[in-house]
Amino acid sequence: MTNHDLASLSQTIETAFENRDAVNTGTRGAVRDAVEAALNLLDSGKVRVAERAADGTWTVNQWLKKAVLLSFRLNPMELVRGGPGEAVWWDKVASKFDGWSVNEFEKAGFRAVPNCVVRRSAYIAPNAVLMPSFVNLGAYVGEGTMVDTWATVGSCAQIGKNVHLSGGVGIGGVLEPMQAGPTIIEDNCFIGARSEVVEGCIVREGSVLGMGVFIGKSTKIVDRATGEVMYGEVPPYSVVVAGSMPSGSAMGNGQPAPNLYCAVIVKRVDEKTRSKTGINELLRD
């Protein structure tokens, strides 16, 4: 699809979104065709909700988010078949694997373990491995990435290549509550078990999050070496663990107030060290 075609597609979707109250399951013609085309492009990985430039900045294609949202107005609730014992579900979004055969799986080149769920319009790159996990619509999962058991990749989230999302990890979506930008995990990151990254935060390339680290837009990310406090973004090649900071105030009874949660950068490593060092060694203080 040419840039001209994409521009025309985005304009149709932008206009439809401005008039979304008029969009419903009975809508036909250009609007439905444009939304279907956008979802197919997302599903195939030909377009992404967010793209990284050479300087590291991320650009969000808001029109693709809007296409995903419009699809909820266009599509009726339907039975989704395929559960154990002929069980069914009731939803507006089809499985990515609906109608797939051996040919489609071989062409896609990733591994989908039984009981993983991937919704249509999510892209899974070759050599990725999906354990029993959930990947929501509009998401992008890069080449060689492992989505481990019970991990969740939220709507429109962007996961880079060679990432490990450990068991029970949650990567937040953008659709509800509505976020300006998707949550992004860049290439070669390791996210420890039961950690959560949400609200459009970015974990930069090569970073390691220890088990149980929670990062949202209001979470203080503290560099232990410098004392710098930052929000919303973990710098490249950071090793991060859960911690706490003094609140700096007293309670009504005069006693010191409880410490408050923060994420602590305990060290930073270069690309060479990160590639040669085991995760457990990096997390040792």
UniProtKB/Swiss-Prot annotation:
One of its GO terms (molecular function) is 2,3,4,5-tetrahydropyridine-2,6-dicarboxylate N-succinyltransferase activity. Transmembrane segments: none annotated. It is found in: Cytoplasm. Gene3D superfamilies: Hexapeptide repeat proteins (2.160.10.10), Tetrahydrodipicolinate-N-succinyltransferase, N-terminal domain (1.10.166.10). The keyword Methyltransferase does not apply. Substrate binds at R111, D148. Its main location: cytoplasm. Pathway: Amino-acid biosynthesis; L-lysine biosynthesis via DAP pathway; LL-2,6-diaminopimelate from (S)-tetrahydrodipicolinate (succinylase route): step 1/3. Its EC number is 2.3.1.117. GO terms for biological process: diaminopimelate biosynthetic process; lysine biosynthetic process via diaminopimelate. GO terms for cellular component: cytoplasm. It comes from the Bacteria. CDD domains: LbH_THP_succinylT. PROSITE patterns: HEXAPEP_TRANSFERASES. Belongs to the transferase hexapeptide repeat family. HAMAP family: DapD. Homotrimer. This is 2,3,4,5-tetrahydropyridine-2,6-dicarboxylate N-succinyltransferase. It comes from Sinorhizobium medicae (strain WSM419) (Ensifer medicae). The lineage of its organism: Bacteria, Pseudomonadati, Pseudomonadota, Alphaproteobacteria, Hyphomicrobiales.
